[in-house]
Swiss-Prot record:
It is found in: Cell membrane. Its EC number is 2.3.1.275. This is Glycerol-3-phosphate acyltransferase. One of its GO terms (cellular component) is plasma membrane. GO terms for molecular function: acyl-phosphate glycerol-3-phosphate acyltransferase activity. It is a multi-pass membrane protein. Disulfide bonds: none annotated. It is an enzyme of class 2 (transferase). Catalyzes the transfer of an acyl group from acyl-phosphate (acyl-PO(4)) to glycerol-3-phosphate (G3P) to form lysophosphatidic acid (LPA). This enzyme utilizes acyl-phosphate as fatty acyl donor, but not acyl-CoA or acyl-ACP. InterPro entries: G3P_acylTferase_PlsY. Pathway: Lipid metabolism; phospholipid metabolism.
Length: 198
């Protein structure tokens, strides 16, 4: 497989990740820019809070699908480990979307899609951590930060190879960076807790 094909599939994965699902849903449903409402984030949690649970779930499904598609694109080329690069490209696209002038979301739902397609140890660990932290605190941001941070450790302890550990480190670092405003609010006691009601 040529280097050009590899570059093209990574670029395509970035574009797939860049599709701003929550932004598009909010524009279509209410004619609003979701970035000007709630937390200002384009992700599923803010869509849930702003438009209601149904649209929040739709945003979650769409963003998760982007991660799945990116991994499938990488595997289609047949280069070992390329699915990790295309997965990382999708996360980068979601976090810094070319369609939103390089603004974007916090990568959690798209990370879920990527992890669904990788060895299950990281997904199982991250999901358990996320559910436990959310149940104890009702902070989606804290649950997401800790769950993302568990991914490289899960891959390392799961013995699936250094490439997966490096991908996990990338995912964790980007997730923490994208949640820096949430971290500041958590430290100040000003972060909003999640409610299943709109």
């Amino acid at each position: 497989m040529s280097a050009l094909a590899v570059i093209l599939v990574i670029g395509l994965s970035y574009l797939v990740g860049s599709v701003p699902t929550g932004y598009l849903i909010a524009r279509h449903v209410k004619g609003i820019d979701i970035r000007g409402h709630g937390s200002g984030n384009i992700g599923a949690t803010n869509v849930w809070r702003t438009l209601g649970p149904g649209w929040g779930l739709a945003s979650l499904v769409g963003d998760t699908a982007k991660g799945i598609v990116a991994v499938l694109l990488g595997r289609a080329v047949g280069v070992p480990g390329l699915e990790l690069l295309t997965g990382a490209a999708a996360l980068t696209g979601h976090g810094w979307s070319v369609f939103l002038r390089f603004q974007g979301g916090k990568i959690i739902a798209t990370s879920l899609g990527v992890l669904i397609m990788l060895p299950p140890v990281a997904l199982a660990t991250a999901a358990a951590v996320w559910i436990a932290v959310l149940a104890l605190t009702r902070y989606v941001s804290l649950a997401s930060i800790i769950a993302a941070s568990s991914v490289p450790l899960a891959f390392a302890l799961g013995g699936v190879g250094w490439r997966h550990v490096l991908f996990g480190l990338f995912l964790a670092l980007v997730a923490v960076y994208k949640h820096r405003a949430n971290i500041d609010r958590l430290l100040k006691g000003k972060e909003s807790r999640f409610s299943f009601r709109k």
